[in-house]
Amino acid sequence: MLPLEHKASGRVQATGRGVRASVELSSVLPQQRAAQLQHQKCNTGARLGRDPRRGVDAERTLVCTAATTASVPSTSGASPSGSQLSSKALRPRRFSAPVIARLLRSTTTVQELADLVQQQSLYMDSSHVGIAMLHLALLVSRAEQQAAAQLQLQLAAKQAATRRAGSGASTSGRARGWGSGPGRNGSGSSSVSVNGSGSSSNGSSSSSSSLAMGMQLSMASIGDDVVSGVNAGPVPSGGADALLDLEMSSILDDDDGAGARQLQQMSDDLAAGLEAAATTTAAPEAGVAAAGGTGAGAAADAAASSSAPSLVAAAAAAAAAAASPASSPDVARTLRTLLSRAFSLGLDSLSGPQLAAVFTGLAVLRRPRQQQQQQQQAGAAGAGANAGAGGVGGVGVSAGDRLVAEQLLAAMGPKLYECRPQDLANTLASVALLGLPPDADLRTSFYAAVRQQQRRFGPRELATTLWAYGAMGTYVQEDAVQLVLELSRARLTSFSPLQLAKAVQGLAALRYRPSPEWVEAYCSVLRPALRRMSSRELCAVLLALASLQVGLDGGTRAALLVHTFSGPLPGMAPGEVALSLWALGRLSAVDMDLPALIDLDMSGRVLDLTSRLLAAGGFSGGELQQLLEGLTRLALQPPLEWMQAFVAALQPQLDKLDAQQLAGVLNSLAAQQYRPQPQMQEVVLAATQANMKQLLADTTCSAALLTALRRLNIEPPPGWVGALLEESRSALKNRCTDLHLANLAGSLAAWGVRPDGRWAARLMWRSQVLMNEDRMSPRALVALLQAMVSLGLSPNPVWTQLCLQAAVRRASQPAFEPHHYGTLMASLHALGIQPPQEWLTRMLLSTYRCWDRFSVTHWSSLLPALVLLKARPPREWLRRFEATSAARLADCSALQLLTLAVSLAQLHQLHAAGAVADTPLLLPGAAAAAAAAAPAGASSAAAAGDSPAALSAVPAAAGDGALVPSFMSIDDDGTAAVAAAATALAAAEPAAHAATSTTTATAVAHPQPQLLPQAQALPQPGPEWQAAWWAASTRLLLRVRYAPSELVLTAGWLGSLGLRPPPEWLQACAEVAARYSKVMDAAERQQLAAAVAPLALEAVAPPSAPPAGAASTAH
């Protein structure tokens, strides 16, 4: 770079059209030069006349020549007149205010600006301080851009050479195609940049160099966190969970959707410096930057994925060098001088725009950079550069910078009404960039200023404001967000792709779900803008939409999926491929229909692309975790060869992953039904045990790990379980959510671990707190009850009362699924809890809400549990069940038919009896003792209620603890509960069969006739339901779907319930018995004959009139 005086001389010679005499700097003394300048000024004004453009050029020529007189020789290069200028001490000359402003804007290096500020700092006014601050930030940003671009190209070349030497020509060809070269966003995406012309462009122009643009505005890109910041671990399923940390690589841009703007007046230079400052601190422009990442952080990422130690060291050194321009002594000295001048002038004397300019420049130059350097060093060391990315201002500014910024904010608050929309947006973004929590007065003043100038807010200001709101987090007023959303809704059609990404990413970071109308308008603009989006912007949009959990229309879903798979995905870098698939996977968690849009051709192309990248070794450890998780969420099941290549690429990088990433990898492998090798299991268990405290701090990651271990049938060693119990004590105290609590208890139950009393007490206490605060979801409540049954825990009356209240409160909500009813009631019985009849009635009435969603499996689980709890359903409930379930009996199995028939008959008997005591907590043991102590000679009414064999069979057996449901995972649909209920029915033999059976087969074959009229007098289901049941059972008999044991059990229960089988059922039963006689021994044949004989006798016996209670109960 030429020194200042040489450059000024060149400008003087370039304006020869209006200047006759050339300036000879090597021979003219400063005093003579001043007089000559005055003479030239007069002659130039006379010649140029009233031409404003030529007048400005000539005046600028004189100003630059005068600056040469007072300038100190620069160290950036040798001056032709340096010997003569250094021989005499030059006295700084005071320039006028317009001259100082134009000189500040005309400097092209930090050294020139520093020299000028040092000379003219005493003569600067408030406007000069703002101009100098913004221009300093612009020059530093350009220097960082050039260093980052050069670094990126060097590292890409070294990495390509290393891959070529290690993997051969074919592998190196793929590495060059995916890891180096400019403009790798593919044909389907282009970078939006500033055009050099004054006319507006079509919105999709190619990128150009910032040096060629001069003072033109540059486009700010999405921060590095879009590509690298999300690798901190697995993302929580379900919502909510953890959005990528929004680190603003730039607070200024000129991507206003209408193309570029060219500076045509000198008064716009301030806005130019403001909008162009720091645009390239984290990302070079698309024409130079590599698609794998931008800036020093992406370069360190690329170096970390390479196995060559020399590249790792080079990346670390280059990353430190790329961050050096902002921390150079010249920048620090100039910044200190400008701030001192601003405070000496008095902050009260500065206007609102001037304060905004000073504050914005300070934010760009003094934003926290330590965190970026730590990430780069971690990536260079191979410890996972992408782990643990923090939010804005995570490291924080220094105490001195924070004090200065707070004073500037305090002075700016009352003057925000003077600022333009552009100043307001940049000020808010600067606050977020520095990580300063604004006070209530500043938020109120900013909100009032936005409302005052809401008509002047353009797309650029609206997008920047939303992005800044997301970076600020909780320090945002809801009214302010709603105002910006209302303003942006009408202007979304003017948003550029970058601004669309900024807006939705800010809302996602703020966790603010916009209205459906705003989402509809956003989607209508997003679909045509996808073609102009870069890969980084597309990833940001996908992640934000998935985090917001907004409902997208079918056209937008299809456009996002098809565009990503067929457009930019083949041209993306490996890291962007993994991130795009991971983002689409998160979006599919919100929209369950998204995986159905992937056809075989699309899935084949994706698997082939990722297979080639796996063979080339282009993925880092965190990217591998993202890749597999994204494919799993998209319901893509890779072949065995792909999984083997994935595990081979992951094996060398296991030691680089943290506990969260290991949990995510293991959970994805479990979802793909791929059991890892024992060596990999040991590495995962050892790493998670060493970081158990960190793992349990993230409840989502710990739940994913526990679920993966259970799904893969991996039983951890006792040391690992001991560490889990020890570190989970504090989590049980104050951090565990409902699902995490249930998952933790269920995992211990599945591994057969019985925790100590203190751990169990904390489990009960934490669950009691969650139920008391109404934070226990139905899914977690049911799973927790099952885990408590398996762990052998006994709840106290207070916990039981809260549990019943939480269950009946949640039963009226849509989250309470049909399978929750049966599992909940069976678990209550197994825990020894007897709910009151009022509670049971309210639970049964709540089933009307989801009655149509009950299947045969759900009914087969619920009805036996109601019998065990001695529930008395309302007559209307029984009628409705018979009317709706009669048509579904044809889909039942033999065991389900038996379960429904026995349970429904006993529920009719319980309803007719109406003699069960309504005690809040009646243990099954006490109920059994009360039934045993009842007098033998009871009345007929009591005999029809408590003493009948069919009524006392299942509850008496359950009183001994016969039904203990096995542990069921949170995602189970109730199959385990059905099996448990069927086991209980099979274990409890019919009372009539048990009372008449003896050790000899002859005694079994002769039932007592006096029991038949008593059985026929019992309440029974309606005739229509019985006819449907007999038809379904006969159909199964004709198809030989009854096992011998099921046939014996069915015949015994039918005789005990007093049901009269039709002749066709008896004929089919006889044919099945004849078939089974060939494979059954003598004892089994005698048992089958003894079970069928009472049914044959009952079929030929004359029917007796049912009692009044039975008739009223039936229909």
From Swiss-Prot:
Residues 69-90, 163-210 are annotated as: Disordered. The keyword NADP does not apply. Residues 176-186 have a biased composition (Gly residues). Residues 483-1068 are annotated as: 9 X 38 AA approximate repeats. One of its GO terms (cellular component) is chloroplast stroma. Residues 69-87, 163-175, 187-210 have a biased composition (Low complexity). Keywords: Chloroplast, Plastid, Repeat, Transit peptide. It is found in: Plastid, Chloroplast stroma. Its main location: plastid. Sequence repeats lie at residues 483-521, 607-645, 685-723, 724-763, 764-803, 804-842, 843-880, 990-1029, 1030-1068. PANTHER family: FAST LEU-RICH DOMAIN-CONTAINING, LD45607P. Part of a 400 kDa complex which is not stably associated with RNA. Required for expression of the chloroplast encoded psbC mRNA, most likely for translation initiation. Interacts with the 5'-UTR of psbC. This is Tbc2 translation factor, chloroplastic. The lineage of its organism: Eukaryota, Viridiplantae, Chlorophyta, core chlorophytes, Chlorophyceae.
